[in-house]
């Protein structure tokens, strides 16, 4: 009822309002009508939405003299607070974020408040990110004779009057708590937020000398803080994960080779088992270097195993044949004779059945020969031994640095053909690995494995210090540097060290003055893509301001005629 009286009072003619010094009240009524007009504009897409800053300023600038009593003042404050914080849409955490953001902006120097108003951050984290970007941009531009760093920030802080601060907090608390107590509506996702702090002056022109001079006085090159780079961290994690996967694969392959015995076993059953193990090792090596031949190798191995099983059965039925075979294998005749076995085999050659032609010799030198299980191929550089010459050839590429496989599109070279095949998918856009949950496709199977952990929530890598779990081993490695204090990434220019490579990349842009992210509207460049995204809001507000007051009045009249 008090609100109705207030609105009747605000409907006075301009002359009567001037006599009672109520010009502000008439202005508030016009704004209320405008808000009512915006509230009915939920079905039209060409009209910009109302700016939450209008509601925040009304709440902050509301005066007791504009009301006819304390009850009406409290009711009006609740209404304005409800319009600003929008508890029917925002959650408690989001409302708290709005209040903290406003207070954070209010304690900054006015020059920084003006600079931040241009971007209108939605959260305290965005505001901090913008300030850190400004620090990176202006760290090399030091103004002599000025006070720098935290001391300058402390001087720029203008605290609120105690009475004003206390009353403002109480009204905020009472308004929000009252709404949550009596409201039964379930909070929805945040759709819009209140943006800058109270009593922020109008922003100057972009890049004004006054703005740049004050900003450069606040930061120095020695106060370079590490900044999060979300858009670069993803590619970095995938890159490191791929390298670790390759190292783990090579280590596993070497361990398998070492586990197989170097002596050639005697006896039919032991020989069969050793040949099976050696064939598995060969199949693993082939699949690591030539992924496309895995199916063929497994098929050949299965045929060999079936034939060897049949041979073992025949030997058990014929003990004399088995004895003759053992004597032949253990005798010195192999080193003296070399004969080729092809096609039809005699009884002495049964048990050799690989279905291929090969030569019996004391020294095996070709990949097509029967594996012996010995590591006869030794690297002259590091002394590492291999069972096959092809594995030694691939290993020597590590020492020589040879990259014979070159991409025809971009000229990038690789040491293995399988790596070239994976690289060419970047140019062709091929993504053969698809997620069964959401249908998203990837060019590498390793990327699909990482993606599937989003659906499963799997985090197999746990920190021993604090128990925090991660889905990737690279994330765990980065996290553990917080406990150890390790900073392996050092700047070659100034010697400053960082615990993440992404931080070092961002830091180097201070020396190179690189700004790779450029706005297509005005041509302004930035060091990070996230800052460019915030910059786009300036152009969005410019498009919204193109609506003239005359068009808004005509739209309001149209809405009234529809009622």
UniProtKB/Swiss-Prot annotation:
Cross-link (Glycyl lysine isopeptide (Lys-Gly) (interchain with G-Cter in SUMO2)): 27, 181, 228, 280, 299, 304, 339, 375, 412, 440, 478, 560
SUPFAM superfamilies according to UniProt: beta-beta-alpha zinc fingers, KRAB domain (Kruppel-associated box), Retrovirus capsid dimerization domain-like
Record region (Disordered): 1-51, 257-373
Key words of the record: DNA-binding, Isopeptide bond, Metal-binding, Nucleus, Phosphoprotein, Repeat, Transcription, Transcription regulation, Ubl conjugation, Zinc, Zinc-finger
Segments forming a coiled coil: none
PTM-bearing positions, type Phosphoserine: 13, 208
Limits of the KRAB domain: 227-300
InterPro entries hit by this protein: KRAB, KRAB_dom_sf, SCAN_dom, SCAN_sf, Znf_C2H2_sf, Znf_C2H2_type
Family recorded in the similarity comment: Belongs to the krueppel C2H2-type zinc-finger protein family.
Function in brief: May be involved in transcriptional regulation.
Descriptive protein name: Zinc finger protein with KRAB and SCAN domains 1
Species this protein is from: Homo sapiens (Human)
Gene encoding the protein: ZKSCAN1
């Amino acid at each position: 009822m008090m609100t109705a009286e207030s609105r009747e009072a605000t409907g006075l003619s301009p002359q009567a309002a001037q006599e009672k010094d109520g010009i502000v009240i008439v202005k508030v009524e016009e704004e209320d009508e405008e808000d009512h007009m915006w509230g009915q504009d939920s079905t039209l897409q060409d009209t910009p939405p109302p700016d939450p800053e209008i509601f925040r300023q009304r709440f902050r600038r509301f005066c007791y003299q504009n009301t006819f009593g304390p009850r009406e003042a409290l009711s009006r404050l609740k209404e304005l607070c409800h319009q600003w914080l929008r508890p029917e849409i925002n959650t408690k955490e989001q409302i708290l974020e709005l209040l903290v953001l406003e207070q954070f902006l209010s304690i900054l120097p006015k020059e920084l408040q003006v600079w931040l108003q241009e971007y209108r951050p939605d959260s305290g984290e965005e505001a901090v990110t913008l300030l850190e970007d400004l620090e990176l941009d202006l760290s090399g531009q030091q103004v002599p004779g000025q006070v720098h760093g935290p001391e300058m920030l402390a001087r720029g802080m203008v605290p609120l009057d105690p009475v004003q601060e206390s009353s403002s907090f109480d009204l905020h608390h009472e308004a929000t708590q009252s709404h949550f107590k009596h409201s039964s509506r379930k909070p929805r996702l945040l759709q819009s937020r209140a943006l800058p702090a109270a009593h922020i002056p109008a922003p100057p022109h972009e890049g004004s000398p006054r703005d740049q001079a004050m900003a450069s006085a606040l930061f120095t090159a020695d106060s370079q803080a590490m900044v999060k780079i979300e858009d670069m961290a993803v590619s970095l994690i995938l890159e490191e994960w791929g390298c670790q996967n390759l190292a783990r694969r090579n280590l596993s392959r070497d361990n398998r080779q070492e586990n197989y015995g170097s002596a050639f076993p005697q006896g039919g059953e032991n020989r069969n088992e050793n040949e099976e193990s050696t064939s598995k090792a060969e199949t693993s090596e082939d699949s690591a270097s030539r992924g496309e031949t895995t199916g063929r190798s497994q098929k050949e191995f299965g045929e060999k195993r079936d034939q060897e099983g049949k041979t073992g059965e025949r030997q058990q039925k014929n003990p004399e044949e088995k004895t003759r075979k053992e004597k032949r294998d253990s005798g010195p005749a192999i080193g003296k004779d070399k004969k080729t076995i092809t096609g039809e085999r005699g009884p002495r050659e049964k048990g050799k059945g690989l279905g291929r032609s090969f030569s019996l010799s004391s020294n095996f030198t070709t990949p097509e020969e029967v594996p012996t299980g010995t590591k006869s191929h030794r690297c002259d550089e590091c002394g590492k031994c291999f069972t096959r010459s092809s594995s030694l050839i691939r290993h020597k590429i590590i020492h020589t640095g040879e990259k014979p496989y070159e991409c025809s599109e971009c000229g990038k070279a690789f040491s293995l053909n399988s790596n070239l095949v994976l690289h060419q998918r970047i140019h062709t856009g091929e993504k053969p690995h698809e997620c069964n949950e959401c249908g998203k496709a990837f060019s590498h199977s390793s990327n699909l494995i990482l993606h599937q952990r989003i659906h499963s929530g799997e985090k197999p890598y746990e920190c021993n210090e604090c128990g925090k779990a991660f889905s990737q081993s690279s994330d765990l490695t980065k996290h553990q540097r917080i406990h150890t204090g390790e900073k392996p990434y050092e700047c070659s220019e100034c010697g400053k060290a960082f615990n993440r490579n992404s931080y070092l990349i961002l830091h180097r842009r201070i020396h190179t003055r690189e700004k790779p992210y450029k706005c297509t509207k005005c041509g302004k460049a930035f060091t990070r893509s996230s800052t460019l995204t915030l910059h786009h809001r300036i152009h969005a507000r410019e498009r919204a301001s193109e609506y003239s007051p005359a068009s808004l009045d005509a739209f309001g009249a149209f809405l009234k005629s529809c009622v």
